[in-house]
């Protein structure tokens, strides 16, 4: 295609690109109506020639129309390929029919020829060239596609399109594709496998198969029935064997053809050779006379009688349905009256209860031995039960009673578990040996559980019993372990009598010796006046009476150079400050009473809450309104501090180590009892927390005897 030819095409015809989809429909109409529209084409061609010069400068002014046309051509590419191919076929016919009248027609025809040339010259692989050439060439034919009735409308549209500019021509449109031809060699063809069917077997392979099987040509259809000889050969093939001869070649061929008909080609190839060898062996051994004799023994084949369809009866569906028949005896109703169990009735017609079974009597040892010895001696019969019973009575007197009880169970177990000896299997066990063995056994004691039926045993085991533990309640405590309380006439429990002997009043030396054990080393036994038992009791009483002085004296003694005699003197003076021990009223009460008293919530008056509870020693302080205060302890303290260290009181020397109990040195001997008890109550209060009421009670009790 030359660039001059593309320029000669009017711009208005090039801009008719959007009408490309309608080109295929009106292609044939353009050929038929072309002679009728010669006048219109001549007029339009003149108009296009005049405005072709105006369209060229407009091509550069409006470049935006190019992408619009390119998008339309790209979307309609598939339609253009088919249309161009058809237009190329119709082009020679159009050229022959069109008369060569005017140069204006030649221009339009030249545009059509250019489109045809581009379509023909383009090769199948030139896809780019087709896209470029279709855009200017195809719109030429869109002009005469319109029918004759719409000629005025087409002219108006053409005039309107002429005002628009054409697409810019680029160098790519002028370039031609010079590369190799593009072809699509891929094609899907179905190739059948060789030998899958008989038709696909090559002729050379058929000749090889025919030679191998001994078949020269295609098998002929043998519709003849098999004779008696052939049937005999077929039946007797499994019974005979021998060397092959040339007598039975015809039967081989006929039988092989039958096999070929029934089987496929693959099975014929593998199965035919062994059949030939086998049948050659069979036919040689049998002679014709033997075959004739064998065939004569067989009768003639009788034709099967044809079935008479009239004799066949149709089965009704209703009768053919399955019916469920009850078996005899499956239900109680189906049991015949003769076989039914009739319960035994009494005179009144009530059924009689079955008699209770007699309890089996305890078997003797001899009976058990007889039962056990049956396996060893099968020929021996059972003896009468009377004979062994007499012997068991004799065995009672002979065997001692204690031995019989111990031997009874152990001997039976040994008999049951002992393995059979091989010597006993040969002969029978003599009766004397069995009797001697029975005499050595004691009498079996009757088990009380043997008489019970099995059901009762199972029920007893299956029951779940809730048993109270021993001692869980007071009722379950055995009487030997119960605590018996001694009560008086009123029913109140009596206090146990004091078993301890009342100790004589303790001297100061004894108390000092008991208290000074922790401070000094071991003393001689001659210094003590009482025995060791009384000393231990006295020490425990002193400790319980004065807890403040004893419990808090945990500090180690000073390592001084004083002698033991000085310590004894100091302890003697310290013991003088202690009062005499008073009996505790709560000491003899039982433990149960103490627990009950503690559990009860009682209101007790606090010390000093009322005037009655104030101790008499402190009442004068309230009467004097706090003016008179005890000045004696500080005066003593000041006097003692003025004394030299050598003349110091031994009580102060000992009490210096007791940091937690300084009240003993400050108080006088007259008020020593009250203050020591107060110090004990004050020391117990922070430890026990909520036990201040009990301490107040003790102070009240100590104050009352003083008032008396």
Swiss-Prot record:
Clinical disorder: Peeling skin with leukonychia, acral punctate keratoses, cheilitis, and knuckle pads: An autosomal recessive disease characterized by generalized, continuous shedding of the outer layers of the epidermis, leukonychia, acral punctate keratosis, cheilitis, knuckle pads with multiple hyperkeratotic micropapules involving the interphalangeal joints, and palmoplantar keratoderma.
Organism: Homo sapiens (Human)
Gene giving rise to this polypeptide: CAST
Name of the protein described by the UniProt record: Calpastatin
Cellular component, GO annotation: cytoplasm; cytosol; endoplasmic reticulum; membrane
Gene Ontology terms describing biological process: negative regulation of type B pancreatic cell apoptotic process; presynaptic active zone organization
Modified residues (Phosphoserine): 87, 133, 222, 243, 364, 366, 373, 440, 516, 527, 563, 575, 577
Comp. bias (Polar residues): 1-15, 68-77, 543-553, 661-671
Reported function: Specific inhibition of calpain (calcium-dependent cysteine protease). Plays a key role in postmortem tenderization of meat and have been proposed to be involved in muscle protein degradation in living tissue.
Entry superkingdom: Eukaryota
